[in-house]
Amino acid sequence: MTSILFEDTFEVKEIDPDGKKFDRVSRFVCYSENYEMDLQIDIATHIYPLGHERFKMVLASSLNLDGSSDNSGSYDTNKPSLADKYDYVMYGKIFKYQKENSSSKVSVFASFGGLLVLLQGDPRYLPGIELDARIYLLIKKA
């Protein structure tokens, strides 16, 4: 059993397209290499500096390597986890799942302690994503 709900490599296309709103956070506009997904993601750049680079992003329901459920939002740092393979990890909630009327795309909105994520694309590549689900977002540079 796997806890990975989505996985792809993204390339940063724009940084803060509407201007810088916060000192330590930037909004990145990205496009995926494999599934043609659009991504807007807020990242705490004082913790995880990112420029016009490629990065791998995973959405997961749990950090447990065996895929077992983890609803606590925390994990035991003394045992191996999915987080060990990534540089930047956030825990949050899907707060909006919207189907586009004019196309076969969906828009998934998530909040990670106020840092927002918008992932848009073909719903075939987002089968385990559900409204109100608690998820982990994991990133490492490609």
From Swiss-Prot:
One annotated GO biological process: transcription by RNA polymerase I
Residue numbers spanned by region Non-specific ssDNA binding: 16-40
Annotated organism of origin: Dictyostelium discoideum (Social amoeba)
Principal subcellular localization: nucleus
Key words of the record: DNA-binding, DNA-directed RNA polymerase, Nucleus, Transcription
Keyword Nucleus among record annotations: yes
Superkingdom as given in the UniProt entry: Eukaryota
Protein name: DNA-directed RNA polymerases I, II, and III subunit rpabc3
GO-annotated cellular components: RNA polymerase I complex; RNA polymerase II, core complex; RNA polymerase III complex
Protein encoded by which gene: polr2h
